[in-house]
């Protein structure tokens, strides 16, 4: 059995862990630096039909309909004068089982972690990553170590682990754009 180490218990880390968990040839361990997973209600997520297609492979299509929303269009407005620039009909890209979807980030995280609770280790901040022969050795700030055959780094845009592997500090690049997303509910 091959051991898979996943650094980061966000959306991508939990998604890939679900895929590996389905295969008995792999043993998965997920490490996250925080003391608990962030399931605050305040954030929303937009899922393209391609991402919904992949999430359906792990049961996303069984999520209750009242926990997600399938918008039909996106309106684009000018920041400067608040005029509507255009409207995009996103429903034309939908299929019966894969629709452009919005939902709370907390709903998506709860869905992704529901079968992984026993695999997630919190308060595990990586301090060192070493390649030793055929194994990868992870050292953590809590003085614990873990060995794995394969390592998946998914700890976000400000990834400490990526910097440890590349031996240099990699900074995200920004292009001064902003996206504001909201749903208007008609009463």
Where are these regions (language model features)?
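Conserved N-terminal helical subregion
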Residues: 4, 48-183
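Glycine-rich FAD pyrophosphate-binding loop
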Residues: 21-41
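Conserved Rossmann-like nucleotide-cofactor binding loop
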Residues: 12, 36, 158
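Beta1/beta-strand and adjacent pyrophosphate-binding region of the FAD-binding site
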Residues: 1-12
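Conserved N-terminal glycine-rich FAD pyrophosphate-binding loop of Rossmann-like flavoproteins
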Residues: 36-54
